[in-house]
């Protein structure tokens, strides 16, 4: 399915809205080149992520190269008549740091990963994140939180979850990690300090360590819930 529309390079309101709202992303001397290309989403993508596919089909799409890196700008009008959207980064598979589950790779092949979002729903999964899904930024395990987690488990006399093979595919600005376990594809949030309404503690684990999202079990559930949050927010 072709979703790309030709954009006027000197009159792209969507990109100007992004530039104004995410002013820190572009440098004063950033080299910006708009491309006239077509975005194709596969039948497999549409079957795996029907809600996300519907959202993408409603988007205004701009293909842009920023400082020699390729991006797609997806833009919509929200219920308050503001332009909102995602700047998605496109990467070659050899830039990925970790082996991913097939659904994650499928998503990246079709639309890339979210580098920035703007004017988003207040409680959406994209809010306040450093990246979402981007292959080159994913990592295994909980990283610098290992000592904190060990201490919390020792204090609460809980058995540690072995998360060394979990893949973190979202990194929040406050350090929280959204991860999946590759075999089961189940999604978890590791957060030391959260104020989310959509998560719950895991039984037999210390509070403010591993959590589960309400209404989300697997990676595909997470993607579709993210899409649904935006579908309800746009016109």
Tell me the role of every PLM-derived stretch.
Residues 170-183, 190-230:
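A recognition module on extended beta-rich or small alphabeta surfaces enriched in W/G with H and D/E
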Residues 158-162, 179-184:
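Short, surface-exposed loop and linker segments with low hydrophobicity and enrichment for Pro/Ser/Thr
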Residues 2-174, 235:
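A surface-exposed partner-binding patch
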Residues 23, 76, 109, 185, ...:
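Short linear sequence elements within intrinsically disordered, low-complexity coil regions
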């Amino acid at each position: 399915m072709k979703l790309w529309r030709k954009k006027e390079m000197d009159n792209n309101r969507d990109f100007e809205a992004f530039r104004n709202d995410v002013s820190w992303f572009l440098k004063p001397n950033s080299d910006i080149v708009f491309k006239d290309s077509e975005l194709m989403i596969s039948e497999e993508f549409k079957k795996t992520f029907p809600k996300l596919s519907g959202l993408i089909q409603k988007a205004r799409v701009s293909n842009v190269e920023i400082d020699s890196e390729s991006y797609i700008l997806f833009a919509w009008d929200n219920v308050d008549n503001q332009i909102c959207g995602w700047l998605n980064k496109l990467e070659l598979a050899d830039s990925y740091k970790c082996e991913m589950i097939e659904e994650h790779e499928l998503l990246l092949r079709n639309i890339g990963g979210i580098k920035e979002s703007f004017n988003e729903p207040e409680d959406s999964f994209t809010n306040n994140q450093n990246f979402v899904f981007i292959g080159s930024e994913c990592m295994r395990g909980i990283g610098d939180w290992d000592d904190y987690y060990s201490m919390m488990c020792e204090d609460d006399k809980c058995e540690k979850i072995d998360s060394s093979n979990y893949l973190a595919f979202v990194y929040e600005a406050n350090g929280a990690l959204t991860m999946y376990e590759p075999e089961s594809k189940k999604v978890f949030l590791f957060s030391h300090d959260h104020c989310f309404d959509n998560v719950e503690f895991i039984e037999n684990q210390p509070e403010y360590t591993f959590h589960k999202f309400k209404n989300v079990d697997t990676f595909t559930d997470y993607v579709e819930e993210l899409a649904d949050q935006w579908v309800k927010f746009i016109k």
